[in-house]
Amino acid sequence: MRIKILRLMVIFYSFNLLGQEIITLPYDNTGLDYQGPEVKTKGYFTDKHNFQNISIPTIQVFLPKGNLNTKTAMIVCPGGGMRANAIHHEGFDVAKALNERGIAAFVLKYRLVPIHLIGKNEGLDHPYSKEKKQLAYGHLDALNAIAHARANALKYEINPEKIGIMGFSAGGAVTMEATYKSSEKNRPNFIAPIYPWMKIVDNQEPPAYGPPIFIVCTTEDALKLAIPSAKIYTDWAEKNYISELHLYHHGKHGFGMRKTNYPVDNWFDNMVDWIDAIGMLN
């Protein structure tokens, strides 16, 4: 029994050495109608689970090993149509890869559409009213995640002026809305929307401080996100802000960190190289 307890203590200690602390972010659910706790559901095209009915926003902290630390940080916003959180291939797997490149990662579970408001066979149909309403809350969670990382920069051994945010699909919408609505204390220093679902984001001007942007999308994406992604790039480029667009053909929606055996598999390495090129990695 004592040996088992010691083994559990070692596992627990090793887990915490990785920095996987979970922080509850400030929130106000006025105007939202949640019933019951968050729910684990089967993920899309995977045996790993997603989360639904998230009513309490959190970040899970993943810190690189000391000798790898570049003092750069990234808030990671998984996708899921504002109804689910694809926390593995668009969250934890991303955090692990970022840590391997010396980047601290904060995986965000932002608030989602209450599960009882989603019809059993209801798809994502225009005008996306539930999802647009939820974005008003989700982007606040992203801003609070940035503010937390910046306020605790010494604790996490990161540079408060090298905090980025990236997101996939609906997480890309959260990324963009947070950027548009940011203030000095919670604005990202660079952003990376990956196949962002811009159909729920109102057309807005890039913020005046001009955060560098790295965009990835495919024309094969069934959600038709290539043109909106190109528009984001054009909006930034017209103002001479640092902007880079990687538009591939092959790659179905939601690839995240999964391998497709197409050139789009290079997107992550390209993103890290870009972060380095704009002076945010060293």
For each feature predicted by the language model, list its residue ranges:
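Bacterial Sec-dependent N-terminal signal peptides
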Residues: 1-22
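Short N-terminal segments immediately surrounding and downstream of signal-peptide cleavage
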Residues: 20-34
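Serine-hydrolase catalytic machinery in alpha/beta-hydrolase-like enzymes
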Residues: 33-39, 44-50, 55-60, 70, ...
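Residue-level signal for short, function-critical loop segments
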Residues: 65, 79-80, 169, 219-221
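Structural recognition of the beta-strand scaffold that forms the well-ordered cores
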Residues: 73-77, 105-109, 162-166, 190-194, ...
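Primarily recognizes the serine-hydrolase "nucleophile elbow" in alpha/beta-hydrolase
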Residues: 137-209
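The feature captures the conserved acid-bearing segment of alpha/beta-hydrolase catalytic domains
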Residues: 189-247
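C-terminal catalytic histidine-bearing segment of alpha/beta-hydrolase fold enzymes
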Residues: 239-282
